Amino acid sequence: MPPIEPHVCPDLKELRRHQETLAQSVRLEPLQGQPETVAGVDAAYAGEEIVAVAVLFDLATLTPVARSFVVARPALPYIPGFLSFREGPHLAEAVRRLSKRPDLLIVDGQGIAHLKRFGLACHLGVELGIPAIGCAKSRLVGEYVEPAAERGSRTLLLDRKEAVGAVLRTRSNVRPVFVSPGHLITIDEAVAMVLRTTAGFRLPEPQREADRFAAEIKRKLLAGEAYANTRCKA
């Protein structure tokens, strides 16, 4: 994928064409082999800088084994529908900085449950060539029937009569999450992996730890601590 020049407000028509081209690269297909590691990725903002983090988990023990982060100016200004172009390059770099390449990504955001079928999980999956799942706390598109109250209950998320994900109850009597495949995985597999990595909380453990780690780095940055070795050059 060609890099996007940072800090430049793009031509929206060109950006939309780029998004449509990349969306054609998304492949929803069964996993090739059983993943052994999974990385949660998330981003936070500290002033004008983005904090992009990746936390690698061992899937068998569901324990963190590595983590990395990048601090940089966002690649683009915020443009509705194009969040992945703002955060994706930095999150991808955080994943690349992990000591081991993950077998699977769980992304705090959407996969194909997106107006253009190209959410943040799709962007990262395509750019990195890694199976990716979007696990969002709120719906972006689509309609659904509320799943039953028990953990593991799910219903399809439908957009224009197309199944774009699942509405999944990861904890009994707690609000569901919106799971959608991003790349190289099916809806059913994405649901199974989210349930497998959820341990007593609403969100998967890799996603929770990525959120916590991003908040920690943000707090330290705002307190004036320097991380010059992790900042991307403008």
UniProtKB/Swiss-Prot annotation:
Upper classification of the organism: Bacteria, Pseudomonadati, Thermodesulfobacteriota, Desulfuromonadia, Geobacterales
Keywords linked to the UniProt accession: Cytoplasm, DNA damage, DNA repair, Endonuclease, Hydrolase, Magnesium, Metal-binding, Nuclease
Site (Interaction with target DNA): 78
Cofactor: Mg(2+)
Highest taxon above the source species: Bacteria
Keyword presence, Mitochondrion: no
Residues passing through the membrane, by range: none
GO cellular component: cytoplasm
UniProt cross-references to InterPro entries, sorted A to Z: Endonuclease-V (IPR007581)
Function: DNA repair enzyme involved in the repair of deaminated bases. Selectively cleaves double-stranded DNA at the second phosphodiester bond 3' to a deoxyinosine leaving behind the intact lesion on the nicked DNA.
Residues binding Mg(2+): 42, 108
Subcellular location: Cytoplasm
Protein name in the entry: Endonuclease V
Family: Belongs to the endonuclease V family.
Keyword presence, DNA damage: yes
Pfam families associated with the record: Endonuclease_5
GO terms classed as biological process: DNA repair
Predominant place of localization: cytoplasm
GO molecular function: deoxyribonuclease V activity; magnesium ion binding; RNA endonuclease activity, producing 5'-phosphomonoesters; single-stranded RNA binding
Catalytic activity: Endonucleolytic cleavage at apurinic or apyrimidinic sites to products with a 5'-phosphate
